[in-house]
């Protein structure tokens, strides 16, 4: 495993730890998810470039499209929750609260 792969995997794991630690605010969770998706994109692009697997050239682009859709839906949800409740706490998204 090369140093670049280790750095990308470390970035992914740090984003995952950030998602697990700072999950009370929706904005922090969305930023950590975006970091995870970007590190997966770079890892997929590097893997395809190193292996010369031409059939999978579109996989990083498809991953980037899904990341953009996830970010757009997350920001729309953030705007809706902050307009409704005034805060961006994730606990406001739970509809089963008493």
From Swiss-Prot:
Topology class, membrane: Multi-pass membrane protein
Membrane spanning stretches: 1-21, 29-49, 61-81
Enzyme Commission identifier(s): 7.1.1.2
Enzyme class, spelled out: translocase
Keywords: Electron transport, Membrane, Mitochondrion, Mitochondrion inner membrane, NAD, Respiratory chain, Translocase, Transmembrane, Transmembrane helix, Transport, Ubiquinone
Gene3D superfamilies per record: 1.10.287.3510
A GO term for molecular function: NADH dehydrogenase (ubiquinone) activity
GO cellular component labels: mitochondrial inner membrane; respiratory chain complex I
GO biological process, alphabetically ordered: ATP synthesis coupled electron transport
Major localization class: mitochondrion
UniProt keyword Transmembrane helix present: yes
Pfam families for this protein: Oxidored_q2 (PF00420)
Compartments (UniProt record): Mitochondrion inner membrane
Catalytic activity as recorded in UniProt: a ubiquinone + NADH + 5 H(+)(in) = a ubiquinol + NAD(+) + 4 H(+)(out)
Recorded superkingdom: Eukaryota
Subunit text: Core subunit of respiratory chain NADH dehydrogenase (Complex I) which is composed of 45 different subunits.
Function in brief: Core subunit of the mitochondrial membrane respiratory chain NADH dehydrogenase (Complex I) which catalyzes electron transfer from NADH through the respiratory chain, using ubiquinone as an electron acceptor. Part of the enzyme membrane arm which is embedded in the lipid bilayer and involved in proton translocation.
Protein family: Belongs to the complex I subunit 4L family.
The name this protein goes by in its record: NADH-ubiquinone oxidoreductase chain 4L
């Amino acid at each position: 495993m090369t140093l670049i792969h280790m750095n990308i995997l470390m970035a992914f794991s740090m984003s995952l730890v950030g998602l697990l630690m700072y999950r009370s605010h929706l904005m922090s969770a969305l930023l950590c998810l975006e970091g995870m998706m970007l590190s997966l994109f770079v890892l997929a692009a590097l893997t395809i470039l190193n292996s010369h697997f031409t059939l999978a050239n579109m996989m990083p682009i498809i991953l980037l499209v899904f990341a953009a859709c996830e970010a757009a839906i997350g920001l729309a949800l953030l705007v809706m929750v902050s307009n409704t409740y005034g805060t961006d706490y994730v606990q406001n998204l739970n509809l089963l609260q008493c």
